[in-house]
């Protein structure tokens, strides 16, 4: 009994701190300097009977700060944080969040920017966070949880908590001598673009360009100044060795014009006149009209398409191939023009010799592209038929509701997705977006054939809300054939590609996932 009493007294007297002891945890959401909160927490803590101990002096905030100055140092708690970070999330929550982000982004992009001439209000002194009533235990949200309104949102009487309001005055720091967030963002963007451009130039200038590294760097977009050379390398038109490139260019250009001299004069022969006539009819229907309707450009496109059709009798000329010439030609011609708008490039100021070389480069790069998707344009176009079927199965797995909605209104995938495969989405996107899309296609293995399938799936699901709102076959088909992408930019394409990559990662190596 005596030993039991001693053991009992021992546990009563033990006040040493051990790992796992219950202590109050303070953070940005629960500041230790809030007297009301501190008192509330102390009152809500149940008292444990202990032996009388000497009262401790109340710690000041300076002591608290010094005692917790190493709160962010690496310690044993890091393992718990890493474990929490690796916990799997609910797939439905992830999908819903992704769709909501894409939808909100689209709504912000579709709203025209409105400039007001009202003077900006003078900055008001930063107010301290309001103290909650004594009966209300709700706390002010932390910076990461507070809602920052978009410029398009209407402001009411209640002002959401901003970052500068939730931090002490000393934490509000002005960077680069300016407080304008837009100026800071533009400056950071400019520095990042300059850095990426330097990386491209270093890769391209080396004696032997590392094509694998070039593909990785090109996936997220290629800067305009280095895009022509990068496309020629990624398409396989030019060799990686710098010293061999001039000779290869000269040889290929000479070979192309030998084809023209040999074949082009036969365009009006009975055996070829139908092909040439169809090309002559299709070119004025292409876009952008400001470029295509220039006589020099029309002649260049006619020669490129006719020579390709003659040299590839297995497929010949098929409508849709003509659209694939435009991105290459525009990218190569922009190297010699200062106009930023790719839809309105004027070739009248480009020397004739330069135009000849661009024509040859365009032909060979387009030929390299078509070599990988030629089954799309052979008899009955089996490649497109197969890809449309795969798209239908893929969409039925990733968004069954959209799939059932289309099927319930008797909308067949061939009715809208055939053009997506035949023209590689060129009729659905502005030319500037197509060029950005092709940056990634050329850096992806089988980008124009395999990865394009996942881009089409992400593109269809991107319009989920609008599709589900349509309740009529004609309205559904009209919407799917005229998608509102006129205001899209590189950021929209990047979001589309990111979603497509996620789908590829989930389904590409698991073909059984296509089927239920």
UniProtKB/Swiss-Prot annotation:
Molecular-function GO term, any one: 14-3-3 protein binding
UniProt key word Acetylation: yes
Ranges annotated as biased composition (Pro residues): 122-133
Disulfide bonds: none
Keywords from the named record: Acetylation, GTPase activation, Phosphoprotein
Domain Rab-GAP TBC: residue ranges: 221-445
Pfam families (alphabetical): RabGAP-TBC (PF00566)
Region (Disordered): 63-88, 102-186
Keyword Protein biosynthesis carried by entry: no
Ranges annotated as biased composition (Polar residues): 107-116, 143-179
Domain of life per record: Eukaryota
Modified residues (Phosphoserine): 144, 166
Residues where N-acetylalanine is found: 2
SMART domains, alphabetized: TBC (SM00164)
Signal peptide, first to last residue: none
Subunit annotation: Homodimer. Interacts with ACBD3 and ARFGEF1. Interacts with YWHAB, YWHAE, YWHAG, YWHAH, YWHAQ and YWHAZ.
Function: May act as a GTPase-activating protein for Rab family protein(s).
Name this protein carries in UniProt: TBC1 domain family member 22A
Gene: Tbc1d22a
């Amino acid at each position: 009994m005596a030993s039991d009493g001693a053991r009992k007294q021992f546990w009563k007297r033990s006040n040493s701190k051990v790992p796992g002891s219950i202590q109050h945890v303070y953070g940005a959401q629960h500041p230790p300097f809030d007297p009301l909160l501190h008192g509330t927490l102390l009152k809500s803590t149940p008292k444990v009977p202990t032996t009388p101990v000497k009262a401790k002096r109340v710690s000041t905030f300076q002591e608290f700060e010094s005692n917790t100055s190493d709160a962010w140092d690496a310690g044993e708690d890091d393992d718990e944080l890493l474990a929490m970070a690796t916990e799997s999330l609910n797939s439905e929550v992830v999908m819903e969040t992704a769709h909501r982000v894409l939808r909100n982004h689209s709504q912000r992009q579709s709203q025209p920017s409105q400039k007001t001439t009202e003077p900006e209000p003078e900055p008001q002194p930063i107010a301290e966070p309001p103290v909650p009533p004594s009966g209300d235990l709700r706390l002010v949200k932390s910076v990461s949880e507070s809602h920052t309104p978009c410029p398009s949102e209407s402001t009411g009487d209640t002002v959401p908590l901003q970052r500068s309001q939730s931090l002490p005055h000393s934490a509000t720091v002005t960077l680069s001598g300016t407080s304008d967030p837009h100026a800071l963002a533009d400056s950071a963007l400019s520095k990042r673009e300059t850095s990426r451009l330097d990386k491209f130039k270093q890769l391209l200038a080396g004696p032997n360009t590392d094509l694998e590294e070039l593909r990785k760097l090109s996936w997220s977009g290629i800067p305009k100044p280095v895009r022509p050379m990068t496309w020629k390398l990624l398409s396989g038109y030019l060799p990686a060795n710098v010293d061999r490139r001039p000779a290869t260019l000269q040889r290929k250009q000479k070979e192309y014009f030998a084809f023209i001299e040999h074949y082009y004069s036969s365009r009006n022969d009975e055996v070829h006149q139908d092909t040439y006539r169809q090309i002559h009819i299709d070119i004025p229907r292409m876009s952008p009209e400001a470029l295509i309707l220039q006589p020099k450009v029309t002649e260049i496109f006619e020669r490129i398409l006719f020579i390709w059709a003659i040299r590839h009798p297995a497929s010949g000329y098929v409508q849709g191939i003509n659209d694939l010439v435009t991105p290459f030609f525009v990218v190569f011609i922009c190297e010699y023009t200062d106009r930023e708008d790719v839809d309105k490039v004027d070739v009248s100021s480009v020397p004739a010799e330069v135009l000849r070389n661009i024509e040859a480069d365009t032909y060979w790069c387009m030929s390299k592209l078509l070599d990988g998707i030629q089954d799309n344009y052979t008899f009955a176009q089996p490649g497109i038929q197969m890809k449309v079927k795969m798209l239908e199965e893929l969409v039925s797995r990733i968004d069954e509701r959209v799939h059932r909605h289309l099927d319930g209104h008797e909308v067949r995938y061939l009715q809208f997705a055939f053009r997506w495969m035949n023209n590689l989405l060129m009729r659905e996107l502005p030319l500037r977006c197509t060029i950005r899309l092709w940056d990634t296609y050329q850096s992806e293995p089988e980008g124009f054939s395999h990865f394009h399938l996942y881009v089409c799936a992400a593109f269809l699901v991107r319009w989920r809300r609008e599709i589900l709102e349509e309740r009529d076959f004609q309205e559904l088909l009209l919407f799917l054939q005229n998608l509102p992408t006129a205001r899209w930019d590189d950021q929209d394409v990047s979001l589309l590609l990111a979603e497509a990559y996620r789908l590829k990662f989930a389904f590409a190596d698991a073909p059984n996932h296509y089927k239920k």
